[in-house]
């Protein structure tokens, strides 16, 4: 009799626990297709600082497109006074989709070179090009 009672109690406790976790789960997320072709991206003026023998550039970026941007990639290129390429940064890659209105911080590191005069940034994503817009504030 006690064995039957213990089995019944254990079974009912197990059902209560599993029933509570099933109802407490978050609703399924809806997948949104990423932007194809040209996407719009806003950014603040880049801030460059020298750290040892590296120049570290930080850029705040905001997705202004209607959909998420998949595979965001940012490159930085440095040129000398004659316009010849001197060096460049390792590309920054954002592995997740950049959702509409989301703000992230891009950090680019470049080794210093005495010939460096000016730089240029290239923004692109896995499904096309990016049209950038300098924002006064975020």
Model-found features: residue ranges?
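Bacterial N-terminal signal peptides that target proteins for export
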Residues: 1-9
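Bacterial N-terminal signal peptides
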Residues: 8-18
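Low-complexity, acidic Ser/Thr/Pro/Gly-rich terminal tails and inter-domain linkers that flank the onset
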Residues: 25-58, 64, 137
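Terminal connector regions
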Residues: 26-28, 110-138
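Short, acidic/polar linear motifs in exposed loop/turn regions
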Residues: 63-68, 82
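Short acidic/proline- and small/hydrophobic-mixed sequence motifs that coincide with surface turns
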Residues: 68-71, 86
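Short aromatic-acidic-glycine turn motif
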Residues: 78-88
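Intrinsically disordered, low-complexity Pro/Gly/Ser/Thr-rich segments with frequent PxxP/GP/PP motifs
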Residues: 86-116
């Amino acid at each position: 009799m006690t064995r039957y009672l213990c089995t019944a109690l254990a079974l009912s406790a197990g059902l209560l626990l599993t029933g509570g976790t099933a109802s407490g789960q978050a609703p399924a997320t809806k997948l949104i297709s990423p932007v194809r072709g040209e996407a719009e991206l806003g950014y603040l003026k880049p801030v460059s600082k020298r750290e040892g023998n590296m120049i570290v550039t930080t850029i705040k970026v905001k997705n202004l497109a209607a959909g998420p941007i998949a595979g965001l990639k940012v490159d930085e290129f440095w040129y000398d006074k004659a316009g010849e390429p001197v060096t460049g940064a390792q590309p920054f890659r954002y592995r997740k989709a950049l959702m509409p209105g989301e703000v992230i911080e891009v950090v680019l590191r470049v080794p210093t070179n005495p010939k460096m005069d000016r730089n240029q940034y290239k923004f692109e994503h896995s499904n096309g090009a990016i049209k950038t817009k300098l924002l006064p504030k975020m």
